[in-house]
Each structure stands twice: as structure tokens, then as C-alpha cells.
């Protein structure tokens, strides 16, 4: 007993550690969110916006005439949907153009190959013997000079999964493979597309050439054509010709297009949601990323239709030129993440940019996640009827949110089912018919609930300014 009394006395004598102030969401807001959730499931605004962008604009590679029309479209759509404020912010970047592309097998087994130039590839015509590598590591391990006068072929088959994790390998082969090939002496580069389909539609995407290297033509083969080329190489020495008409053409300026539903109590504090407005030029950019634009515009619109404005401002951003290097996201972070005051105005941010599959998981993150743990759990509970699981410790910011998250902004992760995303990603098959309207509505409901509750929270989600360089890609 004496020991218990002594222990109690010691504890009373210790200085009290300050309790972490917990961000919470009022019950009235949770009730309103439940109504919004059901309303969003029955609403077709997200579908209509996605259909409009893909039909009226179509492919919209950054810096193109179609990209400029997409900017005008986004401004008009925000206004049509009743956003209080609509404006644009300039984003400048190098302009890359695709004009023509062709490849063929030469010699006794002559036949065409279905390819597409990788974004950032130079134009030119090369022909030579193909040397096949199973993956990027095998190419990097090849002896220096061993590919002199030859064309490197990296034949890695991506595996489909809900979280798309194998894109880490496929994307690296696309972005780093050409430079690795040049270092070994190659005059050209082809890769099995970074995709999980079996259709004769190649997947494009941006590539990079390391400083000091002379770029060479670089292209992706469709999956069936990669299989065909691999079989030919197995039979014996195989020569191919690649002819690309593409390349950089000066600088271009596009725009982040921003719409806001102004907050009633803290209008300078913002919940940021969005998708990217640009697409590659092969398909109509439906799953990548008209869906994200449609989902987040619709979420903002539904919140704006409430009789009472949200406590904080809902800011929806249609980001410029995500595809070629997060230019819109980096420009946004530069303009709106300059200092601690800027960062404190950012309650939290999330981007929809992984197709239109159903959202299956949710989490938030920041420099101080403990303070918002209760609010995050409350949002997760409101999302649970949509089939969304709370996964603490998982996830990360979306691509265009990552630059401002790197500077300290809190982020939310609404994980979309990407099981078939890489069947379509960056291909001519990325078209509206691949989107399930019911799955799209579930996404709209999730973003509406999340954005509204984050805006209504009593407290913040831990945004704290950090003076760091945003990620490059």
C-alpha cells in the first residue's frame, strides 16, 4: 500500500505533459455528410462532366490546341456548376509533339511492329540488331559498349494488382531505360509497354535522358508485339527499324484552372481536391484523368448546393501538365506554399488520378498525424457505407498534391481499385466506355464526404511548412 501511495505522490509531483489537442468533426456535420453521401450516389454530375471533357475536347496533350480548349472548357464548367470563384494560374513547360511513328522487323521475317514513341523521345530513324533484356537491372548490368550499333529491348511484363504497385518497375523501365541503353552504346530503345493488357495498343508515357547523353529514339511496343519480337529474337539475330517523327518544340504555357466554394467561417482556409486536365494524345484521357476532374468538380458542386456553405473553402484544381512532370502540381506548390502562413491555410489536399475504379481504402497523413487521428477515424466511419476501409499508416498524396505535401501540407489518400487501370493507361483504349458510371458515382460520394467533413472539422490536419524542394516526378 505504501508503494502505491508513494508512486501516486511521485506521479503527482511530475510536470504534466500537455495533451495533444484532437481535431474532431461535429455531429451535425456527420449527419449532413450522410445525406450528401446518398445524394452523390444518385447524382450523375461526375459522369456528365467526364463525358463532356472526353467528348467535346478529346485528347489534350499539354501545350496543344486541344489543351488550350480544355482550359477554356474547365473555366466554363466551373462557372456552370456554380462555383463562387473561378480563375487560372499560368504553368510553363517544354512542349513535346508526336507526329508519326513506325517500326518494322527487317529481313527474312519482315513484318510491321505496333509501337508508340515515348514522351520526350527525339525523332529519327535507326535500324539495328535487337538485344533483349528481361528487366532494367539486366540492361544496367550489360558490359559498357556491348550495345554499340544495336537497339536495346527491355521485355519486362508488368503484373496487375489493385494498388498498381508493379508500375514502380514499369515506370522505371520507361523513364530510366533509354539512358541506361545509351550508356551501353545503343542507337535506339524499345520496351514492352508498361501495361497489363493483351491488346495491340502500346502505352506511351514520359521518359528522361540524363544530362550529357545524346538522346536516341525511344518507343514502347504493344504487349502482343513485344511477345512477337521476343519470339523472333529467340529464333536468332533479329534486326528492326524504328522511324519516329516527334520531339521538343520550344516552350508552352497552359494553366491550372481553379474553382472555389467559399467557406462561411474560415474562407481563407482551404480543402484542396482535384485531378489533372491534360492527357496523352492517343486516347481521350477518360480514366487518366477526365474521371478525376469529373469526380472532384462534382464533389465541389454538391457541397456548393447545400443551404449552408461549408466552414472552410472547398478548392477544386484542374491541374495542368501532370503527365510530363507534375508541372501543374509544382506550380501550385510554388504559388500557394511559400511559407508557414500559406501552409496553415491548407487544411488538407487530395487528388483523384488512378482511374475510375471504386475507392476501397482511406487514410490521411501529415507532419503531425496524431492530432487528426480522431477526425480521420470519423471521416473513415462516414466512408464505410461506401465499402471503404480505414487503413491507418497506409497511402500517400496524389501526384499533383505531392509537391505541396513535400512542403508540409496534410494529405488524404482515397485509394482507387486499379486492377485494370494499366490495361488502359496512356493508350488509345483510354476512352469513356471503359468507365462504370456506378463506380464513378461512388468516387464522387467519397470525395464529397471527405472534402465536406475536412472543411467542417474543429481543428486542423497537421499542415506545417517545410522548406524543401518538391519532387521532380
Language-model segments: residues:
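Second-shell loop/turn segments in exported
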Residues: 33-41, 55-65, 117, 128-133, ...
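Soluble metallo-hydrolase cores and metallopeptidase-like ectodomains found primarily
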Residues: 30-32, 108-144, 207-286, 298-301, ...
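N-terminal capping segment at the start of a domain
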Residues: 25, 30-64, 201-206, 278, ...
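Extracellular/luminal Protease-associated
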Residues: 64, 113-217, 284, 390
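Metal-dependent peptidase/peptidase-like ectodomains
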Residues: 108-110, 123, 128, 216-218, ...
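Alpha-helical metal-binding/catalytic segments enriched in His/Glu/Asp
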Residues: 79, 173-174, 181, 257, ...
Amino acid at each position: 500500500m505504501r508503494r502505491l501511495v508513494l508512486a501516486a505522490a511521485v506521479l503527482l509531483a511530475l510536470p504534466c505533459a500537455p495533451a495533444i489537442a484532437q481535431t474532431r468533426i461535429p455531429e451535425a456535420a456527420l449527419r449532413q455528410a450522410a445525406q450528401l453521401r446518398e445524394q452523390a450516389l444518385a447524382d450523375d454530375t461526375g459522369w456528365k462532366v467526364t463525358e463532356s471533357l472526353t467528348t467535346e475536347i478529346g485528347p489534350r496533350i499539354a501545350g496543344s490546341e486541344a489543351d488550350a480548349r480544355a482550359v477554356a472548357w474547365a473555366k466554363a464548367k466551373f462557372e456552370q456548376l456554380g462555383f463562387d470563384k473561378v480563375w487560372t494560374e499560368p504553368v510553363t513547360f517544354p512542349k513535346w509533339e508526336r507526329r508519326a511513328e513506325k517500326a518494322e522487323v527487317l529481313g527474312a521475317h519482315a513484318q510491321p511492329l505496333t509501337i508508340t514513341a515515348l514522351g520526350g523521345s527525339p525523332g529519327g530513324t535507326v535500324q539495328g540488331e535487337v538485344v533483349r533484356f528481361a528487366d532494367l537491372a539486366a540492361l544496367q548490368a550489360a558490359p559498357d559498349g556491348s550495345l554499340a550499333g544495336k537497339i536495346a529491348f527491355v521485355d519486362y511484363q508488368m503484373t496487375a494488382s489493385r494498388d498498381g504497385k508493379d508500375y514502380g518497375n514499369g515506370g522505371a523501365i520507361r523513364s530510366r531505360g533509354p539512358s541506361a541503353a545509351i550508356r551501353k552504346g545503343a542507337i535506339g530503345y524499345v520496351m514492352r509497354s508498361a501495361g497489363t493488357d493483351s491488346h495491340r495498343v502500346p502505352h506511351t508515357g514520359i521518359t528522361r535522358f540524363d544530362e550529357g547523353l545524346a538522346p536516341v529514339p525511344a518507343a514502347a511496343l504493344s504487349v502482343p508485339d513485344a511477345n512477337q519480337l521476343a519470339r523472333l529474337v529467340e529464333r536468332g539475330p533479329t534486326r528492326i527499324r524504328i522511324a519516329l517523327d516527334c520531339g521538343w518544340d520550344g516552350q508552352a504555357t497552359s494553366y491550372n484552372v481553379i474553382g472555389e466554394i467559399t467557406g462561411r467561417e474560415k474562407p481563407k482556409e482551404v480543402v484542396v481536391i482535384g485531378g489533372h486536365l491534360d492527357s496523352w494524345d492517343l486516347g481521350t484521357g477518360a480514366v487518366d484523368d477526365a474521371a478525376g476532374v469529373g469526380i472532384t468538380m462534382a464533389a465541389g458542386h454538391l457541397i456548393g448546393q447545400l443551404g449552408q456553405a461549408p466552414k472552410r473553402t472547398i478548392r477544386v484544381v484542374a491541374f495542368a501538365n501532370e503527365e510530363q512532370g507534375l508541372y501543374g502540381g509544382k506550380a501550385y506548390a510554388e504559388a500557394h506554399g511559400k511559407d508557414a502562413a500559406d501552409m496553415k491555410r491548407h487544411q488538407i489536399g487530395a487528388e483523384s488520378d488512378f482511374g475510375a475504379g471504386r475507392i476501397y481504402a482511406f487514410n490521411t497523413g501529415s507532419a503531425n498525424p496524431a492530432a487528426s487521428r480522431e477526425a480521420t477515424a470519423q471521416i473513415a466511419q462516414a466512408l464505410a457505407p461506401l465499402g471503404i476501409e480505414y487503413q491507418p499508416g497506409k497511402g500517400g498524396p496524389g501526384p499533383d498534391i505531392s509537391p505541396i505535401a513535400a512542403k508540409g501540407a496534410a494529405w488524404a489518400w482515397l485509394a482507387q481499385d486499379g486492377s485494370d487501370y494499366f490495361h488502359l493507361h496512356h493508350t488509345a483504349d483510354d476512352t469513356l466506355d471503359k468507365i462504370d458510371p456506378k463506380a464513378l458515382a461512388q468516387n464522387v460520394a467519397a470525395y464529397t464526404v471527405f472534402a465536406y467533413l475536412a472543411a467542417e472539422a474543429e481543428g486542423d490536419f497537421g499542415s506545417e511548412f517545410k522548406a524543401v524542394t518538391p519532387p521532380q516526378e
